[in-house]
């Protein structure tokens, strides 16, 4: 069984995907922008800005996630677009969270000021939604 778990930044995609993987014993596939940025030796936020202008980054990331998932009979794929890009998923889960909860989770993970995290999260949401519509014709605000 292939399980796809998606949600906006800070919704708990990684947390829930990890828990589902542990409970089921299925391998976790959670290859993200952070991983791709690390591979290329680029700061995460700089990499996000690059992706705003270069659709090939999203396309590569999503292609690699799907390839990893399709190599497994059973797996958990956690990513922002997993429920859309892994068409072969047997179960698709979309996580939602209020902006306040998401910002608090991101703040806990990344530190800095709460105000800064709020500003970055709003900006990231806008940019992600715009990119997903442009690249895939996906509206991640209406599930």
Positions of PLM-derived features:
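Small-molecule kinase domains that catalyze NTP-dependent phosphoryl transfer to phosphate-bearing small molecules
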Residues: 114-143
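ATP-dependent small-molecule kinase phosphotransfer cores
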Residues: 27-86, 99-100, 111-116, 126-128
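Hydrophobic positions on the alpha1 helix immediately C-terminal to the Walker A/P-loop
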Residues: 16
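Hydrophobic anchor at the beta1->P-loop junction of P-loop NTPases
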Residues: 5
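Walker A (P-loop) ATP-phosphate-binding motif of ABC ATPase nucleotide-binding domains
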Residues: 2
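P-loop (Walker A) phosphate-binding loop of NTP-binding proteins
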Residues: 8
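Conserved lysine of the Walker
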Residues: 13
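Short, well-ordered beta-strand core segments
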Residues: 75, 92-94, 143
